[in-house]
């Protein structure tokens, strides 16, 4: 018995000595040797049945070996050993050491993530990110009693950071990412104040910079470019303390968005874009510098005084885009270069040269992925047909010209359904009978009668002085022939004069892409009944759709849906008030949303449902809305939801978002109220009002038995009677409640 006791004492002494050596080796950085000694000590403790010390030395062995595996990038093995060490420390009741193991266990995910990011293995990166988030949550719950020590703060900061990355990068939820990044930098600030560790100061600065950067991105997506610029500047001001180069990037971004915010003001645009270029130079980033130079000349195109200057800007933009490796933009500029050279030659009567440039434009178009109205297959066909028409006229081939003009008029209607009502379409429509008659070898009285009618129409509609001259000359030509004055020289001179009048007509001026889009709005006279703010938003939507790259087309769609949401909000508010009176909001909230969502935060889908409900409830101004329009709304609600909730969703290619938006607005216009603002009340019951629309008259007198407040906004029924051109006697007058800012935005 005594010998056994002596043996146990001897073994214990050996184990204690091994522990001392292990600690010494650990202090000297010899982790593998230290781990081996702890393992030997644990084996001895196991022999003498000292369970507590066995677990303690074994826990040390696992934690040290875990560190070794982590150093050699064997992360799965490292995590396995950290977990074993943690469990043993917990069994021993040494919770702080257990926390230490879990802390470094989580750090292995950070190390491994960096490796996967470098290898661009996004799937594995996301898998590790999700694991980290789940296990960090467990850590924060499991060791919350140690919430005042640095390790706990460290994990919490990283937890917010990783969660923010997940929401931003993989779920497309920028708002949530912003919220978490704000928590992250504020916690880092708290950690620095508590522990005075410079690493926390750096974390605070970096995450604060990133918070401002995300806010800037949010404002970008909302097309609030001034606010985006402001937050990029804040981001730069913050990060420059630890990384001046990143600060230069942020300053360049800030000035870029200020330039775009002022894109219609040449002086300011150039001032800001030159600043962006200056910061790119400071950064030493040649690719970024060339990109901004490309952007500069790209936007200066709109300020060109003539086609020659426009082509010069496009060439410069193309060159810089290529040098910046922004190939999509460069190819787009290459297309525009050929296209505007085509227009230049067409304008100057060089029709064969123009056709050559148009063929080059068509060829280069195959390399362009940017969606734009000017890229329509039918549009380019029309361009070619009208050019060939002028070429045939210039060659005196009137029969061929008639065929080309017929085809042009037919195909042009496929581009824009309301093209028929435009001045340009009517120009060619009235030109056609002149060309048809000139293609004949002999003439009749009917030809003269037809020309008389055409001349009268052209004069009454004031289509074009040049067209009037063409028609008059054609009439003179036929009249001379009919009166047997058929001197070949005289007739040829008149015909040559007609050809000259036709071929010198400026046919390209209104074919420019942006003017085409503006005309699309101008031709829809019914849009004049809407508040100016809505029409301006519609104009912005069309411009955005025209300019945006294919890969960001979904952002343009969201702008259209925001416009429709605001438009429907006004319709629903007015008609619900007219139908249900003071309880309108409560009724809508109960019938539309299971969660009784407040009307103020109704979405596009909620308003579409509300409109259908109002029709079903017998609302007077909604009863004639076709079911086809509700089906169209439902289709776009699905598209909108898909674009909002699926980060990888793309805008459908087979949808005409502009055309559908116009169709929805036009088909529901009878339900859209007239909006007025009371300007004076000196002649009650007649009130002076300003009608908030885009047509005249805007200043009117309105009759009301109920008292109206000066400066307040009111709805009155659609198509309210206007007496004596400037007096209104509406049946319904309702104060505008929720939609004030949509109808009459505060411009201060």
UniProtKB/Swiss-Prot annotation:
InterPro entries in the cross-refs: TPR-like_helical_dom_sf
Extract the Gene3D superfamilies matched here: Tetratricopeptide repeat domain (1.25.40.10)
Q: What is this protein called?
A: Uncharacterized protein MJ0875
Q: Which organism is it from?
A: Methanocaldococcus jannaschii (strain ATCC 43067 / DSM 2661 / JAL-1 / JCM 10045 / NBRC 100440) (Methanococcus jannaschii)
């Amino acid at each position: 018995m005594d010998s056994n006791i002596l043996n146990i004492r001897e073994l214990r002494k050996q184990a204690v000595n091994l522990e001392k050596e292990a600690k010494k080796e650990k202090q000297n950085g010899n982790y593998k040797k230290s781990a081996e000694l702890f393992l030997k000590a644990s084996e001895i403790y196991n022999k003498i049945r000292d369970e507590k010390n066995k677990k303690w030395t074994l826990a040390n062995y696992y934690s040290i070996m875990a560190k070794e595996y982590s150093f050699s990038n064997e992360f799965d093995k490292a995590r396995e050993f950290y977990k074993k060490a943690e469990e043993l420390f917990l069994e021993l009741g040494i919770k702080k050491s257990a926390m230490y193991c879990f802390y470094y266990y989580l750090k292995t995910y950070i190390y491994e993530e960096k490796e996967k990011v470098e290898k661009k293995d996004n799937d594995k990166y996301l898998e590790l990110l999700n694991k980290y988030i789940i296990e960090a949550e467990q850590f924060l719950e499991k060791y919350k009693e140690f919430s005042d020590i640095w390790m706990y703060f460290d994990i919490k900061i990283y937890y917010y950071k990783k969660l923010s990355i997940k929401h931003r990068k993989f779920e497309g939820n920028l708002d949530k990412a912003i919220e978490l990044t704000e928590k992250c930098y504020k916690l880092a600030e708290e950690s620095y104040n508590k522990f005075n560790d410079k690493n926390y100061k750096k974390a605070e600065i970096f995450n604060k910079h990133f918070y401002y950067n995300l806010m800037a991105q949010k404002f970008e997506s909302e097309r609030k470019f001034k606010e985006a610029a402001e937050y990029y500047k804040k981001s730069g001001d913050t990060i420059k303390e630890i990384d001046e180069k990143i600060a230069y990037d942020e300053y360049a971004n800030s000035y870029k968005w200020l330039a775009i915010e002022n894109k219609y003001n040449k002086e300011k645009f150039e001032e800001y874009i030159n600043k962006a270029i200056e910061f790119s130079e400071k950064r030493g980033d040649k690719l970024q510098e060339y990109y901004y130079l490309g952007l500069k000349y790209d936007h200066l195109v709109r300020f060109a005084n003539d086609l020659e200057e426009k082509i010069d800007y496009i060439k410069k933009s193309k060159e810089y885009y290529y040098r910046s490796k922004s190939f999509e933009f460069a190819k787009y500029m290459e297309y525009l270069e050929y296209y505007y050279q085509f227009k230049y030659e067409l304008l100057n009567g060089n029709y064969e040269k123009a056709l050559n440039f148009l063929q080059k434009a068509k060829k280069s178009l195959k390399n362009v992925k940017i969606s734009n109205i000017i890229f329509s297959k039918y549009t380019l066909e029309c361009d070619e047909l009208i050019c060939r028409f002028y070429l045939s006229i210039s060659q005196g081939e009137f029969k061929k010209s008639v065929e080309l003009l017929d085809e042009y008029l037919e195909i042009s209607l496929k581009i824009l359904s309301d093209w028929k009502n435009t001045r340009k379409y009517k120009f060619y429509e009235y030109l056609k009978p002149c060309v048809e008659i000139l293609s004949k070898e002999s003439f009749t009285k009917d030809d003269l009668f037809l020309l008389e009618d055409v001349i009268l129409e052209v004069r009454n509609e004031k289509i074009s002085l040049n067209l009037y001259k063409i028609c008059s000359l054609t009439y003179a030509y036929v009249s001379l022939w009919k009166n047997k004055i058929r001197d070949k020289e005289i007739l040829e001179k008149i015909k040559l004069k007609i050809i000259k009048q036709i071929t010198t007509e400026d046919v390209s001026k209104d074919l420019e892409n942006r003017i085409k889009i503006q005309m699309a709005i101008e031709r829809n006279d019914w849009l004049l009944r809407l508040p100016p703010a809505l029409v301006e938003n519609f104009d912005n939507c069309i411009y955005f759709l025209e300019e945006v790259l294919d890969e960001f087309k979904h952002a343009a769609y969201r702008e259209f849906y925001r416009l429709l949401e605001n438009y429907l909000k006004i319709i629903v508010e007015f008609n619900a008030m007219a139908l249900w009176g003071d309880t309108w909001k409560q009724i809508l909230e109960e019938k539309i949303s299971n969660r009784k969502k407040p009307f103020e935060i109704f979405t596009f889908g909620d308003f579409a449902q509300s409109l259908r409900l109002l029709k079903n409830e017998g609302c007077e101004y909604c009863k004639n809305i076709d079911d086809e329009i509700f089906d169209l709304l439902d289709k776009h609600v699905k598209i909108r939801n898909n674009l909002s909730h699926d980060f990888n969703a793309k805008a459908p290619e087979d949808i005409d978002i502009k055309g559908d938006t116009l169709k929805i607005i036009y088909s529901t216009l009878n339900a859209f109220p007239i909006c007025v603002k009371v300007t004076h009340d000196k002649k009650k019951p007649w009130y002076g009002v300003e009608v908030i629309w885009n047509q005249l008259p805007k200043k009117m007198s309105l009759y009301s038995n109920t008292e109206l407040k000066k400066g307040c906004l009111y709805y009155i029924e659609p198509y309210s009677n206007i007496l004596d051109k400037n007096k209104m006697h509406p049946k319904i007058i309702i104060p505008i409640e929720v939609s004030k800012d949509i109808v009459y935005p505060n411009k201060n």
